[in-house]
Amino acid sequence: MPAPVSSIKIIALAAIGILIVVFAILLAVFHNDLLAIAMPIAERIAKLPMSFLIALVLIAASSIPPLLGQDPLALLIGAVWGLNVGFWTVVCGIFIGETIAFMAYRYFLEQKAQEFREHHEEHYGTFVKIVEEGSYPLIWLIRLSFLPTHFTTVFFATLPELSYIGWAIAFWLSCFKYLVPVYAGYCIVHNKSSAANIVGIVLSIVVTLGTLAFLIVRYKAIKNSTLEDSTNSTSDVLNHLESQPTDSIDLRHLEQTSEQNETDNSERKHLLSHQH
């Protein structure tokens, strides 16, 4: 017997969380190989005037769905442009890119936003309730985690209750999370092994898994509550019908049957009289 759709979706969400963690671990393990490939190109770009603007445009573009690559680019920017310039380049670039995505889906891509709602129709309303319950603290926590922003930004854009200002405040209050990949790139180039970087990665993973677990738990609770309410409503209707007096129902049925029989008999008599 196939698993319920809700269970499949929950398993899918858990799988996404695991993939994010695996990606973060692989990035931490193979960052040297990635930098060895990309560093020569990045160093040539860094020699150009106002080169950080090129990096800003690249990471802004990677923040607009369906393009990818925020974390590797942030790592590279930290390695080439350093901790200070690199961090603000990454944060401003991502903010610009995600602002474009937010505004586009809210005001210019209404059909796409509607398709997004319809594609996730079965579960969209549930997640809206979760966000409404958690309000801005939950929005901030989702922003702070490393859940895919290509999904969360589009989701937030489809919520009329969430203003752009509210979303922007949540972004800036959580932007320090981008220190993790930028500082990792900076440490690699300067041959530093910092405990702070390891702590940052671990905290990011913990926050992401914690947020994902909270969303799954609340999702199941709201789904079960909705199912229970629906069951109770159906039971109330059945109880109401059962409470109706059966005598009056049977009497009406007998009266209708009697009237029908009288009509049939009169028609037969009429036909017989014509035959004679």
UniProtKB/Swiss-Prot annotation:
Ranges where the record places region Disordered: 257-276
What Pfam families does this protein's entry cite? VTT_dom
Q: Where is this region: VTT domain?
A: 78-188
Query: Per the UniProt annotation, where are the glycans attached?
Result: N191
Membrane-side (Cytoplasmic) residue stretches: 31-47, 97-152, 218-276
Compartments reported by the entry: Golgi apparatus membrane
Q: Ranges in the Lumenal compartment?
A: 1-9, 69-75, 174-196
| Primary localisation category | Golgi
GO terms, biological process = vesicle-mediated transport
Q: Signal peptide position in this chain?
A: none
**Glycoprotein: present as a keyword of the record?**
yes
> How is this protein positioned relative to the membrane?
Multi-pass membrane protein
Q: Among the entry's GO cellular component annotations, what is one? A: cytoplasm
What InterPro entries would the database entry show?
A: Golgi_membrane_TVP38/TMEM64 (IPR051076), VTT_dom (IPR032816)
- Please list every transmembrane segment annotated in the UniProt record, as residue ranges: 10-30, 48-68, 76-96, 153-173, 197-217
Enumerate the UniProt keywords alphabetically.
Answer: Glycoprotein, Golgi apparatus, Membrane, Transmembrane, Transmembrane helix
This protein's domain notes: The VTT domain was previously called the SNARE-assoc domain. As there is no evidence that this domain associates with SNARE proteins, it was renamed as VMP1, TMEM41, and TVP38 (VTT) domain.
* Job of this protein: Golgi membrane protein involved in vesicular trafficking and spindle migration.
| Homology family | Belongs to the TVP38/TMEM64 family.
- The protein in question is named Golgi apparatus membrane protein tvp38
What is the originating organism of this protein? Schizosaccharomyces pombe (strain 972 / ATCC 24843) (Fission yeast)
Q: Encoded by which gene?
A: tvp38
